[in-house]
């Protein structure tokens, strides 16, 4: 539980099919739908040890509905250094521009990226097993600018195309 308004749940791979019968993200861009489909394949493919992705969902207790989804795993795609990988972050449209008082007057996406992944998960993993970076690849340049304002840095030339360059947050 984050606070009285939101809680984050981890969905076990064995429960994904059942969960996505209950919650169908309202993905409003074709490119995001393509990324979402690809990211789900990573979660279902738990037999391959190179895939370590886990779905985390945010539930709005007040409104009694799911409002965001994260796919978090690990990657060695950046110079063979293990990083926490935010494979996918999706926030339902009606939650995107709101600064929530319950979250310290920040947007839900910022809370999920910085407070939840970087500060909660990232710091715990850093202290316990020594992974020191959180990595992601933004879907658009506009999102890249937003993540840059949160402290993520672009690693030029790290993607197959410039728009696919990795961004990292050093813990």
Model-flagged regions — what are they?
Residues 1-103, 111-112, 116-139, 144-171:
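Non-catalytic substrate-recognition and accessory regions of acyl/acetyltransferase enzymes
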């Amino acid at each position: 539980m984050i606070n009285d308004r939101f809680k984050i749940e981890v969905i076990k791979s064995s429960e994904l099919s059942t969960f996505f019968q209950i919650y169908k993200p309202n993905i409003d861009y074709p490119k995001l739908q393509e990324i979402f489909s690809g990211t789900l394949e990573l979660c279902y493919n738990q037999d391959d040890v190179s895939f370590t992705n886990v779905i985390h969902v945010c539930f709005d207790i007040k409104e009694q509905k799911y409002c965001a989804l994260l796919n978090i795993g690990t990657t060695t795609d950046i110079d063979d250094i293990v990083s926490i990988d935010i494979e996918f972050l999706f926030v339902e449209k009606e939650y995107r521009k709101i600064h929530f008082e319950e979250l310290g007057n920040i947007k839900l996406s910022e809370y999920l990226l910085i407070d939840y992944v970087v500060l909660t998960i990232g710091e715990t993993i850093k202290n316990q097993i020594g992974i020191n970076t959180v990595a992601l690849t933004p879907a658009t340049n506009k999102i890249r600018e937003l993540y840059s304002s949160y402290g993520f840095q672009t690693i030029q030339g790290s993607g197959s195309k410039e728009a696919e360059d990795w961004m990292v947050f050093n813990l």
